[in-house]
Amino acid sequence: MWKDDAVFKTMQQHPHYHPFVVIYPYDIYKNYDKSEIQQTLERTKRFIEGKGYEYIIPYDSERHQWVDLKSIIKPDVVFFTSPYKDSYPMYYIYHYRDTFTCYVPYGYSALELSSLNYDLIFHNLVGLHFVPNEMHKQISIRTARNKGINTVVTGHPATEVFLRKDYIPQNQWKPQSKPKKRVIFAPHHTINDPDYPSLFLDICDEVLEIAEQFKDEVQFVFKPHQVLKFKLIQQWGKEKTEAYYQKWDEMENTQLVSDGYVDLFLTSDALIHDCGSFTTEYLFVGKPVIYLCRKGIDMTKRFNEFGIHSFECHYKGSNVTEIKRFLQEVVLEGKDPMQPKREQFFEDYLKPKDGILPSQKILKVLEEVING
């Protein structure tokens, strides 16, 4: 998922930088469907082209193989979007020991995954690790072997668009015969994870039935995590997975959206999800949100200290009855007792105290480091 839009645009406007997006395959070692990986690459390419950004695909079409980026350009600065060894070794941080490296995390780290988010070899090697707030920096200091010496608090650039008063979101919603409430259903990919057990496999068909039941008053966007489809193909097979996704795209009041979410968030009325990063990001728009979690599981033990604050701003749902209640009472009837808590959370944790946007802070820090 592309989260560095604001940084890229800020660099484009800066005389010292000429940014490129590098597009290459990920999750290549997880036995995912190869055709789906290729389709993901093509969607990514179209997405970046649609933004008008310069990009590089380090692929030799004559030899049919991926090649070293350094054989095409010699980058002075590399921003990584993932800390994991999920692609070819020539795209790992080890290959850029002679290049200044930076990292903007995928999203607001809300889950209790401290070692994974702050103490991989990657986190200890990267030149600058930009984090959203002081809580995340303290987790890095406590967790990382380098004591978080490369960690800098800037806010998260992926969310600064929500702070801009001049941004006009595009309407991506399917036209309806009359105005309806707009609800996003965004399931995560942890369908078989014992530590973060998803409800998706239990309720996936019933959520479609809910969409049918509320069709006169609500329209839905199915916005799954991009990895969910890979895992469903492994579990269900390609035919059943494609049929399920197609069902979401063909009903009168439903649609499938695979790319981007900013405009969806800004034009929606509510979110149903179980995604770690969305736990905080949706709170920027101030709309009601319900988190899907299994009954009997203490989710507060699965969030870090910051994530607990985010999670406490959510309604909770463990079955379709509670989802329906959320839709009827909160979304349709406007009974929203969590609204004051969400507003206070925004003031306390999300609103920049100095008024400076994260991308501007990131470039300021980068300039200071480069110029000594």
Predicted features, each with a name:
Residues D354-G372:
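C-terminal alpha-helical cap of glycosyltransferases
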Residues M1-L163:
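Active-site and donor-binding regions of nucleotide-sugar-utilizing enzymes
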Residues Q234-T280:
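Donor nucleotide-activated moiety binding/catalytic core segment of transferases
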Residues E54-E62, N253-S258, F311-F326:
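Short acidic-hydrophobic, aromatic-tinged amphipathic segments that line or gate anion-handling sites
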Residues D4-P15, P157-A243, G317-N319, L332, ...:
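Conserved catalytic-core segment of nucleotide-activated headgroup transferases in glycan assembly
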Residues K147, S277-L350:
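Catalytic binding pocket for nucleotide-activated donors in carbohydrate/polymer assembly enzymes
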Residues V22-Y26, T81-P83, P105-G107, H156, ...:
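Short loop/turn segments at strand-loop or loop-helix junctions that form parts
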Residues L69-S71, I121-F122, Q176, D263-L264, ...:
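Structural alpha-helical scaffold elements that stabilize or flank donor/cofactor-binding regions
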